[in-house]
């Protein structure tokens, strides 16, 4: 065999080996895909309800005066009385949080009834917000009454929540998984196959939905508070959990 023929055979052999080396992984991947077991994927849902055990109040004190200093002083005095009353009612310091202080000029704008040529500042308003967590729902009406009497004249929101809903959410999780298993069994029976082990599970939890009281309704309650104790209907909070579960098919 001459040198040219030997070189040709060697090159051909190398090419065959190279093609084979690249073909093996592709063959292995294709074989793995064709042997992957059949599966059933379902979504299970679980819900639990719980009566609220805590109220979150968002209140505000608003004062107006000729000067910003006078408005600030009046606002501080009113807020101090409100905070003192909260503490006397058994609200702990950890459940009281003052928010931002808002100072705004009060303008009078030119119209047919005045001789103003441009907007004029006639005074200032100062408002301070306060978030209160009330852990005894029976005291919410009394606390609102006292707050309005002492100076709260603006209301934001009232939410009835659960302080620690972990146990309720865990029960909702159990119900969601049980619901997923029931769905998978129904599908497997309808398809005439057996249900195998769980190979994948993930949670799609939704945030709890506290029992809110609309802002307009809350302001109406505040306005009525000096004459009558504010009635509070606690209702129930709903906790929903969804799970995605994948089963093997036997």
Curated annotation (Swiss-Prot):
Source superkingdom: Bacteria
Signal as UniProt keyword: yes
Keyword Repressor: no
Cleavable signal peptide: 1-28
Pfam family, one: SIMPL
InterPro entries reported for this sequence: 26kDa_periplasmic_antigen (IPR052022), SIMPL/DUF541 (IPR007497)
Keywords of the record: Periplasm, Signal
This protein's GO CC annotations: periplasmic space
Localization per record: Periplasm
Name the UniProt record assigns to this protein: 26 kDa periplasmic immunogenic protein
Organism: Brucella melitensis biotype 1 (strain ATCC 23456 / CCUG 17765 / NCTC 10094 / 16M)
């Amino acid at each position: 065999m001459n040198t040219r023929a030997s070189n040709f055979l060697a090159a051909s052999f190398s090419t065959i080996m190279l093609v084979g080396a690249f073909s093996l992984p592709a063959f292995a991947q294709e074989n793995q895909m064709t042997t992957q077991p059949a599966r059933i994927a379902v979504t299970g849902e679980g819900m639990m309800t719980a009566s609220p055990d805590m109220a979150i109040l968002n209140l505000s004190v608003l004062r107006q005066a000729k000067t910003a200093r006078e408005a600030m002083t009046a606002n501080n005095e009113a807020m101090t009385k409100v905070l003192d009353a909260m503490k006397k009612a058994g609200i702990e310091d950890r459940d009281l949080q003052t928010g931002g202080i808002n100072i705004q000029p009060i303008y009078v704008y030119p119209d047919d009834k005045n001789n103003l040529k441009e907007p004029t500042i006639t005074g200032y308003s100062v408002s301070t917000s306060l978030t209160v967590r009330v852990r005894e729902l029976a005291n919410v009406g009394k606390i609102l009454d006292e707050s309005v009497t002492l100076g709260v004249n603006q209301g934001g929101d009232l939410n009835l929540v659960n302080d620690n809903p972990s146990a309720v959410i865990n029960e909702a999780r159990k119900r969601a998984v049980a619901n997923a298993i029931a769905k998978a069994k129904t599908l497997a029976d309808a398809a005439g196959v057996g249900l195998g082990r769980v190979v994948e599970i993930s949670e799609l939890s939704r945030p709890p939905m506290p029992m809110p009281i609309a802002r307009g309704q809350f302001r109406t309650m505040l306005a009525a508070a000096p004459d009558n104790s504010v009635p509070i209907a606690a209702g129930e909070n709903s906790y929903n959990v969804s799970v995605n579960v994948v089963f093997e098919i036997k």
